Amino acid sequence: MAVYTDVAADDLAEFLLAYDIGELLSYKGIAEGVENTNFLLHTSRGSFILTLYEKRVAAEDLPYFLSLMAHLASRGVSCPQPEKNRDGEICGTLSGRPAVIINFLEGVWPRRPNVAQCAGVGEALAKMHLAGRDFPLVRKNPLSVKGWWALFEQAASGADPLQHGLRALLHAELDHLDHAWPKHLPEGVIHADLFPDNVFFIGDKLSGLIDFPFACNDILAYDVAICLNAWCFEPDHSFNVTKARAFLNGYNRGRPLEAAEQDALPLLARGAALRFLLTRLVDSLNVPAGALVRPKDPLEYARKLRFHQSVNSIRDYGVETSGLVA
């Protein structure tokens, strides 16, 4: 979450007249995250999140995201639900951006996930993948391997000034992944951005998954690989095998990874690291002046990419290929 687009109080008040969510008491921007503009609204009826969709989110994709949240919730996945306006619509326009109001989920995201929370997010991800099996809409992943070349072109000029040799690393890895990317693994609905700041907990109990603007149809194990990157490294950049084992075992309890998925996981983890390295690099080069946003460090994912390049098999993530559950 972040704030790229400023919203005047009068404009917000007029926008909210179309919704039956009570009288606006206060609102504030949410600086965390990197993609869309978000505000926390406090009204006489409770708390809500207002999201203005920016850059990478196309208006025509919103029905997919919003319908998916309703679908997942109907199957027991805890996630936000959009508020309809008085005309029965869930998407409006505010400050020239598509805008949606969703209900507020209780909980906080873990700044430093513990082992129990890693296991919990593994279980929740498997549950989401299973719940999405009969979701009727389809959205291809615009940020999968073929889309990374366009990101590379945008980011290449800023690579070596950030770290000598980074441009060559990116190009070589792109070339390798483009040729080696698996084509016959199980696919379905994936979150594609399930970082700790998109998962809420109350204590160690997971209370909800949020932020679905990157959700799409792609390789299910790629979603697992994204989480390995996001949840299983420490602040000193070391890989935490205990957390990885807990996460993978948690996932496997709900949806056991097939042998081919296990074999492909190191490659998928490289791809996930490269994807976020590229988007972070692009974002760091294109922060709007005055935006209330903290660009995230691209080099964090360069380090993760190099780690995954050294991985030989899923055993290096702390589990045996004969069975993920200990």
Swiss-Prot record:
Its EC number is 2.7.1.39. CDD domains: HomoserineK_II. GO terms for molecular function: ATP binding; homoserine kinase activity. Coiled coil: none annotated. The keyword DNA-binding does not apply. Pathway: Amino-acid biosynthesis; L-threonine biosynthesis; L-threonine from L-aspartate: step 4/5. Keywords: Amino-acid biosynthesis, ATP-binding, Kinase, Nucleotide-binding, Threonine biosynthesis, Transferase. The keyword Nucleotidyltransferase does not apply. One of its GO terms (biological process) is threonine biosynthetic process. Gene3D superfamilies: 3.90.1200.10, Phosphorylase Kinase, domain 1 (3.30.200.20). It is an enzyme of class 2 (transferase). It catalyses: L-homoserine + ATP = O-phospho-L-homoserine + ADP + H(+). HAMAP family: Homoser_kinase_2 (MF_00301). Belongs to the pseudomonas-type ThrB family. This is Homoserine kinase. It comes from Rhodopseudomonas palustris (strain BisA53). The gene is thrB.
